[in-house]
Amino acid sequence: MEGWRITLLNEQEKTIFVDADACPVKDEILQTASEYEVQVLFVASFEHYQLSRSNEEKWKYVDPHKEAADLYIANHVKPGDIVVTQDIGLASLLLNRNVSVMSERGRLYKEDTIDFALEGRHFSGKQRRKGVYAKGPKKLNKEDRERFITLLQKILSNDEGILH
């Protein structure tokens, strides 16, 4: 029955939480979420508030504290939700809570690789404290965007029982 969706009475609506302060794939998230009829919640600092945001987009603004968006997301996700973030610390916090966590570049964070990512983040922090700075991430390109959309569709399709 194409186009029909059956929701069990005890099934909670899935939400895509987006760590939105510097997220470059907001449009891709909205488009894909619309196709799968999934709620989206963009979480951002009040420092990034804009009056021009579309009414279709759902935004939650939090204090400008460094970790406020992460804490909001961590406190509001539920099993089955999806989180889009580039924050490795937030990803590590959510992985054991049955939440799919992915980067803006279309990489799925996994429990068996998150420790390595955390070690890399720790090493980079130590280097910065010594005054050694690495280049920042490359600008998001078309392939990154396509990989992101493909992974998000795969997660949502698998959740709907459509296996890839």
Curated annotation (Swiss-Prot):
PANTHER family, sorted: UPF0178 PROTEIN YAII
List the gene name: yqxD
Q: Which Pfam families match?
A: DUF188 (PF02639)
Protein source organism: Bacillus subtilis (strain 168)
Q: What is this protein called?
A: UPF0178 protein YqxD
- Coiled-coil region(s): none
What lineage is this protein's organism placed in? Bacteria, Bacillati, Bacillota, Bacilli, Bacillales
Family, per the entry?
A: Belongs to the UPF0178 family.
